[in-house]
Curated annotation (Swiss-Prot):
Pfam families: PAPS_reduct. The lineage of its organism: Bacteria, Pseudomonadati, Pseudomonadota, Gammaproteobacteria, Alteromonadales. Belongs to the PAPS reductase family. CysD subfamily. The gene is cysD. One of its GO terms (biological process) is sulfate assimilation. Residues 280-302 are annotated as: Disordered. Gene3D superfamilies: HUPs (3.40.50.620). Keywords: ATP-binding, Nucleotide-binding, Nucleotidyltransferase, Transferase. With CysN forms the ATP sulfurylase (ATPS) that catalyzes the adenylation of sulfate producing adenosine 5'-phosphosulfate (APS) and diphosphate, the first enzymatic step in sulfur assimilation pathway. APS synthesis involves the formation of a high-energy phosphoric-sulfuric acid anhydride bond driven by GTP hydrolysis by CysN coupled to ATP hydrolysis by CysD. Its EC number is 2.7.7.4. It comes from Shewanella denitrificans (strain OS217 / ATCC BAA-1090 / DSM 15013). It comes from the Bacteria. It catalyses: sulfate + ATP + H(+) = adenosine 5'-phosphosulfate + diphosphate. Transmembrane segments: none annotated. This is Sulfate adenylyltransferase subunit 2.
Length: 302
């Protein structure tokens, strides 16, 4: 009897699908976070595969800060219409009423109120006991030490010094009422794996990932896309057209573009093979305070 040898990507795919199915079977009310980025697109594709030909048996949740790229929101709505999944959106209305934004309140306060607090509001409102996220261990040092099943207490806080063991891919999903698990089925994937899988599976992604001529403003040494008229121009700043793309996506004032000629998947993969810089170097929220990401995760951020 011939033994089937799985490729590297097939092994990653099988592991992720097993995790997704396990959560769907084990938890009462799971949800999949949908940030609209490349990792979310891969995770959505894996969820569709996991339950094909049936529909995904849990909703997708997008925390809308009001500052996402316009192309991201258009892509989100198009994907929901195309695949027919249940899409929930949530915005922190208190933050909206207070006029909280990245330009007026800074990245740390904006992220806390419009992302972290909004996420906790949505999880509490719907009573979700498990939430899938597209984080990978190779992205950032605090994520590198987080478990696939990441326990959160009643306040959605993460304690990196009190994590559950995960031996032989055996995951502990036991929670009391009010507690929850954040689940990361892409934990063992790398950025290059993600791009190669997108290429292999022909997965649709937001066009912002591809290099194109775009209007940007240089702020603090970073190229910020002028996505709408809410961006203030400081003295000496001017809008200019540059050929850029994004390696990661978030709120447009807090996500820097990079110069690139990679306007196809093949060119992006070639660029990834040569790059020596961090994927998240363009995410301003990662450097707005000391140990920034770990601090945010302790407070309930994904």
């Amino acid at each position: 009897m011939a033994v089937q040898v799985l490729s590297h990507l097939q092994q990653l795919e099988a592991e992720s699908i097993q995790i997704i199915r396990e959560v769907a079977a084990e938890f009462d009310n799971p949800v999949m976070m949908y940030s609209i980025g490349k990792d979310s697109s891969v995770m959505l594709h894996l969820a569709r595969k996991a339950f094909y030909p049936g529909k995904i048996p849990f909703p997708l949740l997008h925390v809308d800060t009001g500052w996402k790229f316009k192309e991201m929101i258009a892509f989100r709505d198009a994907q929901a219409k195309k695949f027919g999944f249940e899409l929930l959106t949530h915005t922190n209305q208190e933050g909206v009423e207070q006029g909280v934004g990245p330009f007026t309140h800074g990245s740390a306060k904006h992220t806390d109120i419009m992302k972290t607090q909004a996420l906790k509001q949505a999880l509490n409102q719907h009573g979700f006991d498990a939430a899938f996220g597209g984080a990978r261990r190779d992205e950032e040092k605090s994520r590198a030490k987080e478990r696939v099943y990441s326990f959160r207490d009643r306040h959605h806080r993460w304690d990196p010094k009190n994590q559950r063991p995960e031996l032989w891919r055996t995951y502990n999903g036991a929670v009391n009422k009010g507690e929850s698990i954040r689940v990361f089925p892409l934990s063992n994937w790398t950025e290059l794996d993600i791009w190669q899988y997108i290429y292999q599976e022909n997965i649709e992604i937001v066009p912002l990932y591809f290099a194109a001529d775009r209007q940007v403003v240089e702020k603090g040494g970073q190229l910020i896309l002028k996505d709408d008229d809410r961006m203030p121009l400081e003295a000496g700043e001017a809008v200019k057209t540059e050929k850029v793309r994004f390696r990661t996506l978030g709120c447009y004032p807090l996500t820097a573009a990079m110069h690139s000629e990679a306007d196809t998947l093949e060119k992006i993969i070639e660029e990834m093979l040569l790059t020596r810089s961090s994927e998240r170097q363009g995410r301003l929220i990662d450097s707005d305070q000391s140990a920034s990401m770990e601090h945010k995760k302790r407070q309930g951020y994904f």
